[in-house]
Every structure is written in C-alpha cells, then in structure tokens.
A protein has these predicted regions:
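Glycan-binding loop/region signatures in secreted carbohydrate-active enzymes
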Residues: 266-333, 365
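Conserved, mostly hydrophobic/aromatic
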Residues: 79, 158, 223, 264, ...
C-alpha cells in the first residue's frame, strides 16, 4: 500500500533526523593518570539476572541516549559512547561532548561499564599503511592509551571499518596488521586492568575476509559483529538484516570466536529510499520510522522472508520505501542467536530503539 505524506508531516519527520556535528580536537600527548578498572557495585535483593546487553551512545543525540541508558541500567553491562575518531597514528580527535565526566560518572553509578568507541573514516589505504607498519602501530597504541588514561574509562572499543574493502593483493597483510594492533593494545590494556573490544563487519561468503576472527577472538575481550546494513543507504531498498543472514554470520563466527566473547550487533534504525533516485537513503531511527509510518497512515507489515518491518508511501510524486527494525523483528531474530549459544548483544544505538525492544531483550537470546 502506498500513502501520501503532507508537507507538514515531512517537516515533522525531518526534525527528528540526527545531524552529525563537527569534530573537536582531543590531545592526549601525556597520561596524567591511568585509572584501574571501575568495580560494578553489588546490588541487594539476591543475584540479579545477568546483563547481556551493550549499546553505543551517539554523540549527536547524547543526552537522550544517556537518559535511555540510565532507564535500562539493569539490562546494560556496557555503554560505548561514540566519542572519538582516529585521524592518524598519533592523533585521535573527540566529537562534541566527548569525555563528559557527568555521563561517565552517571553510568558508573548505575553499574555500567564505560568503554568509549574510537572510529575512523580514513581514505582508502591510509589505515592500511598504519596497520602494516610496526612503528606506526606502536605510536597509535600510545595515543590510544593516552585517551583511555584521560578519563575513568574501563577500556576501549576499536571500530576501524575502512579496511573492510581491502583488495586481493593486500587484505591478508592488512588483516594481520589489524590483529597485531588489537593484540598489542589488548595486552597493554589488560596490564592496566582494562578491557579491549574489537568491532568488526560480518564474515560471510562474500564479505569480511580482512578480519582474522580466530586470532581476534583469542586476544580481545569481546568481538562485536555489526550485523546490520544488509541493505544500505547507497544501495537498493531491502531489509537491514534477515534471519538467514544471521544464521550465516553466526555459523562462521562461532566456528572461530568463543561464543561468550561474541556481541551480536542489533539495528535500531532504518533507511528511507526514494524510488528511481541516485540519492542515498535517509536515515531514520526505529522510533522515527514508526512516527513516519503513522504520519503517512501506512499499514504495519513484517516481511516474512527477513522478519523485518517495512512500508511504502508517497512524498510529492515520489514513491519512497522504508525498511527498519523494531521489537517484533528483533524477537524473530533472537532464536538464531540462541541456536548458536550467543547470548550477548550490542545495540546501535541508544535512544534510537522501539521502546518495546527492552522487554524482548530481557527475555534473552
């Protein structure tokens, strides 16, 4: 079914879209104090259920995401603020709001680990050159340790995605360099009582070959698999994930990584594509997708093949298609995790999600 959207509704939807902000410089040339791991306070009333959910906290929606984390603290074991970006071997910049002590302290008080994410958006070949140079890797580890020591962080999460498309001639060397970086960084962090996470792309028959899952699973405390963007903003419309895709991802991952170290990434967002347009899809949070669906009076539909929701509508003379994930779709995906013995998840991202997701996650994978 296709429905029309009014200009007023368009304005309403666009107001809820996240808008990334410019970076602020972070300099960590010296370490003032390397803090030990923060202890999670004991809770009374008997042993609580295990916390199996982690989540990323987006800097461009920081306050809402922080309040969302506090509201679901009993389910969250780790929050990773999406705060930092690697620019070179020796330079790591902070996004707006990076390192806000109020948030770090508040999460710790709620018994949640704070493990910031360091991402990168380097041009092709730049990160590969860093990873394949032992000297530059050593410089980069020093910069990352400086960052960890700048606040009461519990460790670090590396989200280095630009190497995913490394070509045939160099992907083995680049993958080995990334593994060496993670191995040496984790060793240094463990000596300080800190944790070390690696965020990676899914490994399938056609993707993810640069990631040495087996070696990463030996040295990292957790390996986070970004199990979303099966269809992406600049591609053709379709589901962000599917149960069959999850099966392929986990069949390969659990053959190489201890299941207790795997965190399966869950999407809490969607894409809104314009039919016949080369323009990339609009990003929507899961909550925003539902607001849009109701605004255009589109019926709710769960795709039986992928077990993800979708709808179409018209904006002006253009047909638009939205695919996203919600609590109902996630509930259909979790049995795949259970079949492989994977019980830990990581959500992209806080305050994006369908509010009903938390009760689904509470029942566990």
């Amino acid at each position: 079914m296709k429905t029309r959207i009014s200009a007023r509704a368009v304005r309403r939807i666009r107001r809820i879209r996240p808008r990334p902000l410019p970076l602020l410089a972070f300099t960590g040339a010296t370490v003032l104090a390397l803090c030990g791991a923060v202890l999670v306070p004991a809770r009374g009333g008997g042993a609580p259920p295990p916390r199996t959910v982690s989540a990323w906290l987006p800097y461009w929606a920081q306050e809402g995401a922080y309040q969302d984390a506090l509201a679901h603290a009993d389910q969250l074991r780790t929050v990773s603020p999406f705060w930092y970006e690697t620019k070179s071997a020796t330079r790591v910049d902070g996004h707006p709001g990076a390192g806000e002590r109020r948030i770090i302290d508040g999460l710790h008080a709620a018994g949640i680990q704070v493990v910031p994410t360091v991402m990168e958006q380097m041009k092709p070949g730049v990160l590969a050159a860093l990873l394949t140079s032992p000297d530059r890797r050593a410089e980069h580890i020093t910069a990352l340790l400086d960052l960890v020591g700048s606040r009461a962080y519990d460790g670090i999460d590396l989200d280095y995605e630009s190497i995913a498309s490394t070509g045939d001639a160099t992907y083995r060397a680049v993958g080995a360099g990334y593994t060496a970086l993670v191995r040496d960084l984790c060793s240094r962090l463990h000596a300080l009582g800190k944790v070390c996470f690696a965020t990676v792309n899914p490994k399938t028959a056609t993707t993810g070959r640069v990631w040495e899952y087996g070696s990463l699973g030996q040295v990292a405390d957790r390996v986070r698999i970004m199990a979303y963007n099966l269809h992406y903003a600049t591609g053709t419309p379709g589901p962000l994930s599917s149960t069959a895709w999850y099966d392929e991802i986990l069949r390969r991952a659990t053959a190489e990584i201890p299941v207790e170290k795997i965190e399966m990434g869950l999407p809490a967002y969607g894409w809104d594509w314009a039919e016949g347009s080369d323009e990339g899809a609009r990003h929507l949070t899961s909550k925003g997708a539902e607001v849009l669906r109701e605004a255009v009076d589109a019926p709710y539909g769960l795709d039986p093949a992928s077990q993800t929701p979708h709808f179409t509508y018209q904006e002006g003379g253009t047909v638009r298609t939205v695919w996203y994930q919600d609590a109902r779709g996630t509930e259909a995906h979790l049995p795949v995790l259970s079949r492989y013995g994977v019980h830990n998840t990581v959500l992209w991202a806080l305050d994006f999600e369908d509010p009903g997701l938390w009760s689904v996650l509470a029942r566990g994978a």
